[in-house]
């Protein structure tokens, strides 16, 4: 007896506006599987010319990684019937930037670390299997683990130019 294989799409869109300072206001829409829309904002701290009026983009990124993995841990603990009780997760994301004179800096990731603490009666092996399943189901972690091509276009008049 073969199990049914289901495929599903998860699709987001975001419209972002930056009126001239470091703050960016965004309307983020989940189109699939369950339509939902919210407004978010980012800003930079004073050292980068911002006002600190909202979380920095990397704060949202770090929180997004933590929340995505946490969601999968909780969802899969229920699906796999693994008793883990309360779950605590801590991330440490480290990048390094290099700048020559006044030129724009270039950045690269140095290390991303995630510490997970679970309560409950699950064995160590069950916890490891749960974490492995959650890693595979975490959209953010899977995106980070693969080479990705990100398309960029610039609007020029009424046309779009590939960058």
Residue spans of the language-model regions?
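Extended beta-strand/beta-hairpin segments
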Residues: 1-63, 74-163
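Alpha-helical metal-binding/catalytic segments enriched in His/Glu/Asp
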Residues: 68-69
